[in-house]
Amino acid sequence: MFIMSSISHAQLGWNDAGTPVSDQFDDVYFSNVNGLAETRYVFLEQNHLPQRWHNDDQRRFVIAETGFGTGLNFLAVWQAFVAFREANPDAKLKELHFISFEKYPLSKSDLIQAHQAWPELAQFAQKLHKHYPLAIPECQRIVLDDGLITLDLWFGDIKDCLPKVATQEQGLVDAWFLDGFAPSKNPEMWNQGLFAGMAKLAKHGCTCATFTSAGFVRRGLIDAGFAMKKVKGFGTKREMIAGSLSEKVPYTNIAPEFRFEATHGLQEVAIIGGGIASATLATTLARRGVAVTLYCADEKPAQGASGNRQGAVYPLLSGDHNAVSRVFAPAFLFARQWIEQAAEQINFDHDWCGVTQLMWDEKATDKLKSMLEGDFPTQLVRGLSAEQTNQQVGVPVDKASVHYPLGGWLCPAELTQGLIHLLAQQGKLTAHYQTPIDELTWQPETQLWQLRSGDTLMSHQCVVIASGHQFDSLSQTAELPLGKVKGQVSHIPTTETLSKINSVLCYDGYMTPVSQQNGYHCIGASYDRQHLDATFDPQAQRENAQKLIHCLPEQTWPLEVDVGGNQSRQGVRCVSRDHLPFVGNVGEFSKITEQYRDLAQQQEAEPIALYPQLYALVGLGSRGLSSAPLMAELLASQMCGDPMPLGVDLLEQLHPSRMWVRKLRKGKALTQKV
């Protein structure tokens, strides 16, 4: 079992100058005199910012920081980068990525109070407040200013978090801000392990600056490979130290059997699909300046599993913090942020009404009570008594439950179609409908993929397969061990009683509150592995209603659910056995079978065989609305060579070749789907 410590918020006091003081470390968060000026001098000026940005030929500049604290350093850099971009709109450098580690994050209320000291940063601080995440362990990604700024907040002890940051051999970080409380106040952080970890993540030429001039810090950084020197300190402080990495020693923490590759100089991509995976990925790539061509087999987007009227948005959590839970907790928070940002640009039916899971039988009760033992923040999930559940749901259920206050529902069809149409209007996406891709062929001489649809041939630098249950129509992904499950969702008219339901209700099925747009609820959904067509199933229609009656036999209002109108929608889900999506480079099945035939005996695996510039985003299952935005962000980060939004061990759990590798490690042959 993975052991994960819950995150404690910082305990603060405020001194006479109005400066926050840590109770844990008995130290101020920033200078009593002029904290913002000190930040600019110590961290921007000594890292030669913004001067370096003018000559940088990268698309994205990466800063890493020890100790997020009040976010002052981040806000100051954000302000400086916006000014740089406004003054230099044609500069090659387009985006800023800020990675920060924090063991004791401030609560949102303390963060807001601390930011009152800097009114000139208010416009940036308010955007941060809006999306400041819950204190969930590991990485929480926030995308700001439509992708101009990306903030990765790693919550937890830096000695645990730093090794989880996925790092390719060339490194990741352009500048280090070595901040945090004074070494004398926080000796656990300031050690050789930290300095060595900084060097491992650093790129060639990475700079470093810190407010302290402590000799052991300077010597430790030198031992780690940085060339450090003393410089004039800020204000009355005599000295501080700054420097740069002398020589980059290649380092990676990515296992060869789970390696992934970026597409160097990515300019354009073909996405095969048309559902929520395609729409979120297209949006995320377009933010990075990548031109998108969409090939959709249907006459318009969202005709498959993403075409429902109402879909629930809530996380899949586990009390033992297994891989699924560690993916879905940050994925849900990112989805919530992402959906709110999308709602500022397009219209789609949605309601953050909360989601309530009923303890309707002994098995469900045991499972949900076990989940609550995971010590999650109550803003994410909390247990409710039967009486509290009745009040929360709006109709009598007389069952205890767990409630997700930040959850809700949205119309996936409207979201998917709205995103794709918006990108097309902006000239960032070209869509080809009724264009199924029959064949993919890699052209070594041009380093391009050739796509065939009927008699028509197209060429693209990079291809992503995001076609849901149709993943096996192409030879490159035909062997992926994914399943297909048909689902039928029933549309039922509301009644006076049913209209009182004000939370998504989950039991052995689910029921949504009424949509104010059409006066209907959604109830479902069936699971059928035998019949994978899109035809209406009268038995599934009856069973959708019967599940609610079965789970709440003492209540009369479920009898008002009328499925007799036979209104419904059918789709086929693409599912994985371990409940996690398949995200990343597509492995070359035949070569992997050969190269890893004796993997169980190999001391160190050779790098896994991957198709060049070919990726997959499939297997989103029943929780695609909660996972798709972060999975798209993860894949875009991988394709573009950006920092990853999840720990390196979780990337292994999402790798499209993971099940093949697991089987081969056990000495079993890959003769058929795993």
From Swiss-Prot:
Report any one BP term from Gene Ontology.
tRNA wobble uridine modification
Where does the source fall among the domains of life? Bacteria
Stretch list, region tRNA (mnm(5)s(2)U34)-methyltransferase: 1-246
Q: What EC number(s) has UniProt assigned to this enzyme?
A: 2.1.1.61, 1.5.-.-
**Which compartments does it reside in?**
Cytoplasm
Key word Nucleotide-binding present: no
UniProt family annotation? In the N-terminal section; belongs to the methyltransferase superfamily. tRNA (mnm(5)s(2)U34)-methyltransferase family.
Which PANTHER family does the protein's record reference? SARCOSINE DEHYDROGENASE-RELATED (PTHR13847), TRNA 5-METHYLAMINOMETHYL-2-THIOURIDINE BIOSYNTHESIS BIFUNCTIONAL PROTEIN MNMC (PTHR13847:SF283)
Please report the name of this protein according to its UniProt entry: tRNA 5-methylaminomethyl-2-thiouridine biosynthesis bifunctional protein MnmC
